[in-house]
From Swiss-Prot:
It comes from the Bacteria. Its main location: membrane. InterPro entries: LipoPS_assembly_LptD (IPR020889), LptD (IPR050218), LptD_C (IPR007543), OstA-like_N (IPR005653). This is LPS-assembly protein LptD.
């Protein structure tokens, strides 16, 4: 029998049309909003979990206010009663009911669909044996239903699903899970879940949480967000243990104060140290963002003096206009061992100082201006570092005729020191530069000359070799050239392009005695391959070395047919034509260490990187780093590194590191890292983590042991203590905040370095 098709128009069948539309219109938003917040999943989970099937297609051709009914049999009695039977489909513009039978009664203002009933819209799929819709009180009831939130991968059952225009949505005898059907590793069972109209939170009553059919905990009353908007409430706790803190439990409480700012208050209980309070306040506007962190631990139980311990930090970045920016980083802590003992989300336990700055910056095509206050919080018994209070920098550049460029770099700084007996200084510097840069596809050339004039006013210099007033003027000239030669070649059977790129630089800087100038912001740089052509041996301006030198270097690349670098080798060295007279830069040889760099993409899975500096005077390696990586995917990699420094502050450094991430079974991942001090024959850090990640839950177990750098009462640093810890994290996706399974990979790979610099 050919199915009958009936299209109902408001003019012809107004009451029947009205009976169907309120049902759709009133439940669409509450159900959609509920599923969005409760079922939010990570990107990883959405990739691995099967999504509920939804075959509904929006009927775009139906205008608003019109429904379409298709059935095998249709009976209409006196415009008061309509009955449909056999493969009944009731469709409006964006929803559909399919049933064996359906009745529309004008007298009772009810629509009843029975027999294998299914309701679908783009977000929701419901199956039952009966749907009752009453348009008089705007109420829909679906008994013994199975529901699926199709776009957000959640599902459950309800003894009764009720949608009421005034009371909202109510599910009685309801279960909820984001696990695949038949594989409900976790499940929430509640007497009721209600969502009131125009409210952003729902309420579950008498809720039991089951894992593998075992009840884990019970909540008589649970309020949860039903929109994607931020909501005030408890976040997932963090549990861990370490030799420094003992057992530690953190319970964050989130405060949604305003769309543009929020706060998190986190009590942290540590069995060894007591109760700590951590607070975080964030704000974000169209042009500004910032964060305030305050941590306070009263009467540290593990301290011999039961001292109060604290940490604070304020950061801000903002745009005052299109050209003006401001940045702030202000911080402090109670003692040198705070980070070592209590940890930090912002600093490393090996840090020797905290950097503070307040900056105002102006940027344009020709002029850049920067005004900064720079200070340091020194940890331990280290020499007090000079702070710039303030430092003004101005850079101006303009094009001249015939390809020439003219730029001026200038600075004005006031240097102070927390140590009241150290010298202080005001420094002014200006350096005009005239250059001729030429560049094309086969090479480049640069001719540059500059004059560097610096003036100092130094104070508190009694008992030193410094002079009160110093004026220093130096001239500098540079010639730099590079060529690029190419040829077609074969590389392991593939057609490639090989380049040969020789480069040379001559640099001359005049000499002036600088022994009467203090060191305020100057430290020595080491020369890797790129540093050979830098022309600058020190940071800052307090020491500018005299130079009469030639730098030679060469680079060769292998480029495949897809224009990707497969191999790059660089060699370079500085040849000193005269000895340096500036004491801090004096050389014992007529040439620098030979610097080499190697990057090699070995096939599609192996990557290698190496840097080495070899002294031509002793034929010994001064510095080296070697890295080899095997990578199949983002979470499937193995990397081994070795770092060597012959003389770093009087000590030789030789360290071996191993970093790995590998899936060991379906949904199971392992990450680890290990660093060993070869000279001292000891492991300085070990980290291992095991993670199970499915679409609906995740388990992460991490163990770590690392060398700590504690300071004694005299500020002297000890590197013989270790801190061990273990942490366990259990996440049930869909009942609160979730983070991707990559978090453990990110933490485990902290310190991982990209092993190559190929383009």
């Amino acid at each position: 029998m050919k199915p009958l098709k009936l299209e109902l128009n408001p003019r012809d069948f107004n009451h029947y049309q009205a009976a169907f539309l309120p049902y759709r219109m009133k439940i669409k938003q509450p159900l959609h909003v509920l599923c969005f917040s409760v079922c939010s999943l990570s990107a990883v989970a959405q990739e691995t979990c099967p999504a509920p099937a939804n075959t509904f297609v929006v009927e775009k051709r139906l205008p608003n206010g019109q429904i379409q009914v298709i059935s095998n049999m249709t009976s209409i009695q006196q415009d008061n009663f309509a009955e449909f039977e056999g493969d009944v489909e009731i469709t409006n513009k964006d929803s559909q009911i399919i049933a064996n039978k359906a009745q529309i009664d004008r007298t009772t203002q009810q629509l009843i669909a029975t027999g294998d009933v299914s309701y679908q819209n783009p977000q929701l799929s419901v199956t039952s044996q009966k749907v009752l819709l009453n348009t008089q009180n705007n109420r829909m009831e679906i008994a013994d239903t199975q529901y699926e939130l199709t776009t957000l991968n959640a599902r459950g059952q309800a003894e009764l699903l009720v949608v009421d225009q005034t009371q909202g949505l109510e599910l009685n005898g309801v279960t909820f899970s984001t696990c695949p059907t038949g594989q409900e590793d976790w499940l929430v069972h509640a007497d009721s879940i209600t969502v009131k109209p125009d409210e952003t939170r729902g309420v579950a009553r008498n809720a039991f949480f089951y894992v593998q059919d075992i009840p884990i905990f019970y909540l008589p009353y649970y309020s949860f967000p039903v929109t994607d908007a931020r909501e005030t409430g408890l976040l997932f706790p963090q549990v861990g243990s370490s030799s420094s803190t003992g057992f530690a439990y953190e319970q964050p409480y989130y405060l949604n104060l305003d769309p543009q700012y929020d706060a998190t208050i986190t009590p942290r209980y540590m069995t060894k140290r007591g109760l700590q309070l951590k607070t975080e306040f964030r704000y974000l506007t169209e042009n500004n963002s910032g964060q305030i962190d305050i941590e306070y631990l009263p009467n540290d139980s593990d301290s011999t003096t039961n001292e109060d311990r604290y940490f604070y930090r304020f950061t801000h970045k903002g745009a005052l206009s299109d050209d003006w920016e401001v940045n702030v980083d202000f911080n402090g802590l109670s003692d040198d061992n705070y980070i070592v003992d209590l940890g930090s989300d912002y600093y490393n336990s090996a840090d020797t100082h905290l950097f503070r700055t307040l900056g105002l910056h102006y940027y344009s095509d020709a002029l850049n201006v920067s005004l900064q206050l720079r200070d340091f919080e020194i940890l331990g018994d280290h020499d007090d570092t000079y702070r710039a209070l303030p430092e003004l920098k101005l850079d101006y550049v303009t094009d001249l005729p015939a390809g020439f460029k003219f730029d001026i770099h200038s600075e004005l700084a006031r240097f102070d020191n927390a140590n009241g007996t150290s010298p202080k200084a005001t420094r002014a510097h200006i350096a005009p530069t005239l250059s001729l840069p030429l560049e094309n596809s086969w090479g480049e050339f640069l001719a540059e000359t500059s004059i560097m004039h610096t003036v100092y006013r130094q104070e508190d210099i009694e008992g030193t070799d410094l002079s009160r007033d110093v004026s220093r003027t130096l001239g500098q000239a540079k010639l730099y050239g590079a060529l690029v030669f190419e040829r077609q070649a074969h590389w392991f059977g593939d057609n490639v392009t090989q380049t040969l790129e020789p480069r040379a630089q001559y640099l001359y800087t005049s000499y002036e005695d600088q022994s009467d100038i203090g060191l305020y912001d100057t430290t020595r740089l080491f020369n890797d391959f790129a540093g050979l052509f830098r022309g600058q041996e020190f940071t800052g301006l307090d020491r500018i070395s005299d130079k009469n030198q030639v730098t030679l270097g060469v680079t060769s690349r292998i480029i495949d047919e897809d224009n990707r670098e497969q191999f790059k080798l660089s060699l370079g060295q500085i040849f000193y034509l005269e000895d340096n007279k500036v004491t801090a830069a004096s050389k014992e040889d007529d040439r620098s260490a030979l610097a080499a760099e190697l990057d090699w993409r070995i096939g599609s899975k192996w990557l290698a990187h190496s840097e080495v500096q070899v002294s031509t005077q002793t034929d010994k390696v001064e510095r080296s780093s070697v890295g080899l990586e095997y990578r199949l995917a983002r979470d499937k990699m193995l990397q081994i590194n070795h770092r060597f420094v012959r003389d770093l502050s009087g000590e030789q450094i030789s360290q071996l590191g191993l970093t790995a991430s590998w899936p060991i079974a379906q949904d199971w991942y392992w990450v680890g890292r290990w660093y060993r001090d070869i000279d001292r024959h000891r492991t300085i850090e070990s980290y291992t983590g095991l993670q199970y990640e499915s679409c609906c839950w995740a388990l992460r177990i991490v163990a770590q042991r690392q060398l700590t750098s504690r300071f004694d009462d005299d500020g002297l640093q000890s590197t013989d203590e270790f801190d061990s810890g273990i942490a366990i994290q259990f996440l049930f996706k869909g009942i609160g905040g979730d983070s991707s399974g990559r978090d453990m990979l990110r933490d485990g790979l902290f310190g991982y370095r990209q092993p190559y610099l190929l383009d």
